[in-house]
UniProtKB/Swiss-Prot annotation:
Organism superkingdom: Bacteria
Cofactor remark from the record: Binds 1 nickel ion per subunit.
Annotated keywords: DNA-binding, Metal-binding, Nickel, Transcription, Transcription regulation
CDD domains for the chain: RHH_NikR_HicB-like (cd22231)
Reported cofactor(s): Ni(2+)
Organism: Chlorobium limicola (strain DSM 245 / NBRC 103803 / 6330)
Recorded family membership: Belongs to the transcriptional regulatory CopG/NikR family.
General function of this protein: Transcriptional regulator.
Protein's name in the database: Putative nickel-responsive regulator
Metal-binding in keyword set: yes
NCBIfam families linked: PRK00630.1, PRK01002.1, PRK02967.1, PRK04460.1
GO process terms (BP): response to nickel cation
Gene Ontology terms, MF aspect: DNA binding; DNA-binding transcription factor activity; nickel cation binding
Binding annotation for Ni(2+): 78, 89, 91, 97
Length: 134
């Protein structure tokens, strides 16, 4: 673990009270842990905006009986084989499937993949969760 630095900050009482309620609801053990997570999240957003390298997961549900949807999804995934690390396919019921796609690459590549999958007719829902690649 890297060396820890202590510093002080000044906040309005209403802001710190709201923050304390938030960290309590999220079960943080301390303000420091919550603040570290907020800083990491903001740095990740900056990395995303600047096109840096990210890792993450695309989670989508779709109707596998929709004509030609499976072929389209597979074609798109093959076009992004350098971005996709792995996929997991789950049968939810007779008509619906859940697919989890682990990804790594530039933010632009990952977002382009997610968008191309999301707009296909028959895709019910798609969410993208990103994290740092390192």
């Amino acid at each position: 673990m890297s060396e820890l630095y202590r510093f002080g900050i000044s906040l309005e009482k209403t802001l710190i009270d709201a923050f304390d309620r938030h960290i309590s609801a999220q079960h943080y053990k301390s303000r420091s842990e919550a603040l570290r997570d907020l800083i990491r999240e903001e740095l990740l957003k900056k990395q995303w905006r600047e096109g840096g390298s990210v890792a993450g997961a695309i989670v989508m549900t779709y109707d596998h009986h929709k004509r030609e949807l499976l072929n389209m999804l597979l074609d798109i995934q093959h076009d992004f084989q350098e971005t996709i690390i792995s996929t997991q396919h789950v049968h939810l019921d007779h008509h619906h499937c859940l697919e989890i796609i682990a990804v790594r690459g530039t933010a632009d590549q990952v977002e382009k993949l997610a968008t191309q999958l999301k707009v296909q007719a028959g895709v019910k829902h798609l969410s993208l969760s990103i994290s740092t690649a390192g």
